[in-house]
Amino acid sequence: MEKVGVLLMNLGGPERITDVGPFLYNLFSDPEIIRLPVPAFQKPLAWLISTLRSTTSQQAYLSIGGGSPIRRITEQQARELQSKLRDKGLNVTTYIAMRYWHPFTESAIADMKADGVDQIVVLPLYPHFSISTSGSSFRELKKLRDSDSEFQKIPMRCVRSWFSQSGYLKSMVELISEQISLCESPDSAHIFFTAHGVPKSYVEEAGDPYKEQIEDCSLLIIDELEKYLGHTNPYTLSYQSRVGPVEWLKPYTEEVLTDLGKAKVNDLIVVPISFVGEHIETLQEIDIEYKEIAEKAGIVNFRRVKALNTHPTFIDGLSELVVSCLEGPIINIEKASELPEKVKLYPQEKWQWGWNNSSEVWNGRVAMIVFLILFIELISGSGPLHKLGIL
């Protein structure tokens, strides 16, 4: 029987406090996360940002137990999926490829080659495609495949996005309905989707389909939820986790929470729509930061829907995705990593970065000047930022 390797791709996360700095460095070294007009500055800037943000990020991870649970949860998902697929009669072994922390993609490739898999199904644990999530992981996998003649011999099929998959939608509906059932007035409970944001330029200039897929997904979930419950609930979609001075997708989660409080919303059902497992954005950002904002705004009942993790219906859905991928038309790594025609992702491809095209030159100059000032101050150990207590 053909031996199939199912490669689950995910973000990764620091497992210990000491991992936070290196994890952030890996994250910001990715040109699909931060784009610079001068590629040579990518790694120095990644070092600078990770150095500046480490302490704050470490405090966030301490508030959820000292590390990210993303590896543990992804390993549980992999085991459950492997078991489900073997129950279907498939000779499947699951592997994990994290983008920014262990186990890295290189490790998964080595394991698959050592195990002698005959075919690979690549399944990103991101329901919605984005340049900075699935796109980055696909492109990293393609780069490694292109440089490995032995790896190239193994046939590969990819799942690009799967936000409309029935098992995924059903599992979301089941978890949302659990929280709605706890409300005194289930019909009026407000469904609050919060998705991880991306810079607005990703969508408007780079052609990232992420925003459209998130919006379509929220409508599909609401439609299925109405069929399941027999009534319609009001809902809102927002975007969280923005960083830096550039404009991200709107509306911002923290601002919408304040508006909903002013609108006298009592029962809020918070749905982390772009996350399939618990991690820092759900456990700390939503459960602590956003809950505090909501309570200050006057929202009485803040109920957060659990992440999918190993919810049985979700695992069933993932298994159906793998089977469909094996039986359906082939989407190879070249097609999966393909970006919209108008995307110009890297600095050498001259995609303008910043707030708008006309500000490209000045944004680049200002960024480089700020970078050099910060770099000199970090090396010298003195300067205005030290006097202000920032460094």
Swiss-Prot record:
GO molecular function terms listed in the Swiss-Prot or TrEMBL record: ferrochelatase activity; metal ion binding
Q: What class of enzyme is it?
A: lyase
Which InterPro entries does this entry report, sorted A to Z? Ferrochelatase, Ferrochelatase_AS, Ferrochelatase_C, Ferrochelatase_N
Give the CC-aspect GO terms: cytoplasm
Which annotated residues bind Fe cation? 196, 281
> What keywords are annotated for this sequence in UniProt?
Cytoplasm, Heme biosynthesis, Iron, Lyase, Metal-binding, Porphyrin biosynthesis
State the Gene3D superfamilies in the record. Answer: 3.40.50.1400
UniProt record, GO biological process: heme biosynthetic process
What reaction(s) does this enzyme catalyze?
A: heme b + 2 H(+) = protoporphyrin IX + Fe(2+)
Give the EC number(s) under which this enzyme is classified. Answer: 4.98.1.1
In what pathway does it function?
Porphyrin-containing compound metabolism; protoheme biosynthesis; protoheme from protoporphyrin-IX: step 1/1
Major localization class: cytoplasm
SUPFAM superfamilies per the UniProt record, alphabetical: Chelatase, Chlorophyll a-b binding protein
Q: Where in the cell is it found?
A: Cytoplasm
What role does this protein play? Catalyzes the ferrous insertion into protoporphyrin IX.
By sequence similarity, the record places it as follows: Belongs to the ferrochelatase family.
The record, for HAMAP family, names: Ferrochelatase
User: What name does UniProt use for this protein?
Assistant: Ferrochelatase
Q: Which gene encodes it?
A: hemH
